[in-house]
Amino acid sequence: MSPTRMPALFLGHGSPMNVLEDNIYTRAWAHLGETLPRPKAIVVVSAHWFTRGTGVTAMEAPKTIHDFGGFPQALYDTHYPAPGSPALAQRLVELLSPVPVTLDKEAWGFDHGSWGVLIKMYPQADIPMVQLSIDSTKPPAWHLEMGRKLASLRDEDIMLVASGNVVHNLRTARWHGENTPYPWAESFNNYVKANLQWQGPDEQHPLVNYLAHEGGSLSNPTAEHFLPLLYILGAWDGVEAITIPVDGIEMGSLSMLSVVVGA
């Protein structure tokens, strides 16, 4: 392992309003950007690009996607003009083989799961980035293995950033007033934290089998916000430190847990 190996991050992105707000979560992301080694490029996996098959942004100047509605105009006026990297996109095609990866040269860009956190980490938007989609047709263990395939990039000064929420149930969210976590949400969030460093066969991994937890299906009625975590755990070497820079549950059922591997 390189002494300058880049960390791998899972960031609980939460509401798009975090882009405009100053709170414990946004300050934690900013602190990571200030204290972690500066990468030469970033590969980001966001819950908001959930596709059939795997794609990677491959344009020179990806657009900022405002994939949300009903928020203040200031949010739609905010852009994150980080450069793309067609060369890095091609590198992912080769690295992830035999998994077929489509080079997306115009359709996607950076959605709020990616730019919404990176605008706090690297507000200058001057680090080349590509975004990798999450294949909705694959089981959890497959995504863990994808993280393993990406791990070698960390020795090339490339940071892996995954963005989601390990508890994400908007149907039960308390949008106004009471903010106390639901017991099942707190239980599942604790279950995730307790199993971050689990080692053993993939098919037995508690976080691959997250729906077996009594609060798993309530915490994640759909998979897209949970799966990004598995990419980061797949990139762990089994020895390096795993730390939690910030944690919390907002609106009763939205976990803001963030995880850093290797810093």
Model-assigned labels for residue ranges:
Residues 9, 41-43, 128-130, 159-161:
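Conserved beta-strand elements of the Class I
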Residues 2, 35-36, 121-125, 152:
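Solvent-exposed alpha-helices and their adjacent loops that cap or buttress functional pockets
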Residues 46-48, 108, 158, 163-166:
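Short, well-ordered beta-to-alpha junction loops that form the rim of enzyme active sites
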Residues 9-10, 67-72, 122-130, 207-208:
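Short, basic/glycine-rich phosphate-binding loops at helix/coil junctions
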Residues 2-103:
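A short aromatic-anchored loop/beta-hairpin motif
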Residues 75-83, 105, 133-140, 216:
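Flexible, glycine/proline-enriched loop segments at strand-loop-helix junctions
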